[in-house]
C-alpha cells in the first residue's frame, strides 16, 4: 500500500481518509521500511497534506493508542499544541492547563518531550515533580482527584516508534508534527491548539471537528508563535461543533495590555519550571515585563479554553471575564493547589487507597501552600 501511496503523492494526488489510515496503519504496525516511511512523508509534504489525509492519519493513530479513561469527559479539554515554532518560549500551554483545571475544567494534557525547543511539556512537568510516564489508571486517577493528568505520548502511542527513526533523520516537519494535538488518547471534547504555521489553523480545526471534538480553537500568534500573542494579532480558527470560522484575537479583546513578547523566552526544564512555580506562588518572575508576559499569555489561553467549556453559543465578549477567572487562579493559590494535588497523586503507587488519598488532599488548602514554591 505504501509504495502506491508514494507514487500517488508524488503525482500530486490526495489520498482518501481510508487510504491514509491504511498507510499510517502499515507504518505503525511495522510493515514499512525506513526508506518507504521517509519517502512517503516527504512526498506528502511536497504535495501538501489535505484535511482528509490528516484525519485518516489521526484515526489510524487513535485506533492503536492505549485508551485513557477520562472522568467527566463532557468538561474535558486539552491545550496540547504542535510545537515546532522554534521560538523557545516558556511552557505557556502547560501553565494554562493548570489555570483551567483550577477553574473547574477537566484537563487531559497530551504531550511529549522537547523536539525543536529546549523544554517540552513532559520536560517541564517532570521538573515540577509530576510522574510523566504513569500507567493509564494513574493518569485517570490524577484527572479525577486533581482535575488534571498527563498522557505521555510515547507511553500511549507506542506504535509510533516505527516512524521515529525516519522522522529524526529527515530533520524536517512532516504530518506527524500535526498529529499530537489530534490524537489525545482521552478523546477530549474541547481543545485549544497552537500551530507553528498560520496556514494550518483552519485545516487542523476542521480535522478536530471530523474526529469528534465538540469545540476547538486553533491559534497562531504574531511573530510566528504557536500561542496567543501578547503583542499584535493572533489568527484563530474556531470549530463550534458545526462549522469552522476564522477570526483575529488581540490582547485588547481580553482587556489585556500589550507587553513585550521577549518576556516569554524560556530555557531548559529547570529554568522553566522555576518560572511556573513562581507564577503559581504569586511571586514576580521579572525583569521588566516578563511576569506580565507569562501571566498574560497563559491566562489568555486559559480564558479561551474556559469559554469553549461554557454551555450554549461561544461568546467572545465573555473573554475578559474568563481572563479574570484564569488570573485569579494564578494569584489566589488555586492553581498552586492543583499542582500540589497532581504531584501527590501522580507519585502515589497504583492500588493505593484512593479514598484515603483524596480525603488527605481535600484537607489541604491554598492558604497552607502560600509562600511555598
Give the positions of each predicted feature.
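Glycine-rich anion-binding loops and their surrounding alpha/beta cores
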Residues: 8, 14, 63-66, 89, ...
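N-terminal glycine-rich anion-binding loops that anchor highly charged ligand groups
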Residues: 1, 9-55, 63-70, 297, ...
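Active-site cofactor/substrate anionic-group-binding motifs, chiefly glycine-
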Residues: 48-111
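Active-site-proximal loop->helix
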Residues: 114-130
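Acidic, glycine-rich active-site loops and adjacent beta-strand->loop/helix elements
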Residues: 81-86, 111-117, 156, 222-223
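N-terminal basic/disordered segments at the start of proteins
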Residues: 1-13, 79-82, 87, 371
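Short, conserved micro-motifs enriched in small and acidic residues
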Residues: 34, 87-94, 115, 292-297
Amino acid at each position: 500500500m505504501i509504495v502506491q501511496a508514494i507514487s500517488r503523492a508524488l503525482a500530486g494526488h490526495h489520498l482518501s481518509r481510508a487510504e491514509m489510515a491504511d498507510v499510517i496503519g502499515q507504518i505503525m504496525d511495522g510493515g514499512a521500511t525506513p526508506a518507504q516511511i521517509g519517502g512517503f512523508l516527504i512526498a506528502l509534504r511536497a504535495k501538501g497534506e489535505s484535511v482528509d489525509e490528516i484525519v485518516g492519519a489521526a484515526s489510524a493513530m487513535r485506533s492503536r493508542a492505549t485508551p485513557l479513561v477520562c472522568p467527566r469527559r463532557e468538561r474535558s479539554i486539552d491545550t496540547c499544541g504542535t510545537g515546532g515554532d522554534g521560538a523557545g518560549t516558556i511552557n505557556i500551554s502547560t501553565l494554562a492547563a493548570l489555570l483551567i483545571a483550577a477553574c473547574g475544567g477537566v484537563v487531559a494534557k497530551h504531550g511529549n518531550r522537547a523536539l525543536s525547543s529546549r523544554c517540552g511539556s513532559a520536560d517541564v512537568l517532570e521538573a515540577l515533580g509530576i510522574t510523566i510516564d504513569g500507567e493509564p489508571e494513574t493518569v485517570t486517577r490524577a484527572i479525577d482527584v486533581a482535575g488534571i493528568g498527563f498522557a505521555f505520548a510515547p507511553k500511549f502511542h507506542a506504535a509510533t516508534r516505527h516512524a521515529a527513526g525516519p522522522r529524526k533523520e529527515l530533520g524536517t516537519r512532516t504530518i506527524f508534527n500535526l498529529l499530537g494535538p489530534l490524537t489525545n488518547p482521552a478523546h477530549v471534547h474541547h481543545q485549544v491548539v497552537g500551530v507553528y504555521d498560520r496556514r494550518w489553523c483552519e485545516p487542523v480545526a476542521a480535522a478536530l471537528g471530523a474526529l469528534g471534538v465538540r469545540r476547538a480553537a486553533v491559534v497562531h500568534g504574531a511573530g510566528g508563535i504557536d500561542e496567543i500573542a501578547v503583542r499584535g494579532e493572533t489568527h484563530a480558527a474556531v470549530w463550534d461543533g458545526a462549522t469552522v470560522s476564522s477570526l483575529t484575537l488581540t490582547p485588547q479583546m481580553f482587556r489585556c495590555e500589550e507587553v513585550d513578547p521577549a518576556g516569554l523566552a524560556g530555557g531548559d526544564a529547570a529554568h522553566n519550571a522555576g518560572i511556573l512555580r513562581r507564577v503559581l506562588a504569586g511571586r514576580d518572575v521579572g525583569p521588566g515585563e516578563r511576569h506580565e508576559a507569562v501571566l498574560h499569555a497563559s491566562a489568555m489561553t486559559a480564558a479561551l479554553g474556559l469559554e469553549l467549556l461554557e454551555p450554549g453559543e461561544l461568546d467572545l465578549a465573555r473573554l475578559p471575564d474568563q481572563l479574570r477567572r484564569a488570573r485569579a487562579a494564578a494569584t489566589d493559590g488555586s492553581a498552586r493547589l492543583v499542582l500540589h494535588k497532581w504531584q501527590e497523586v501522580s507519585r502515589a503507587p497504583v492500588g493505593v487507597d484512593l479514598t484515603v488519598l483524596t480525603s488527605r488532599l481535600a484537607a489541604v488548602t491554598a492558604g497552607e501552600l502560600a509562600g511555598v514554591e
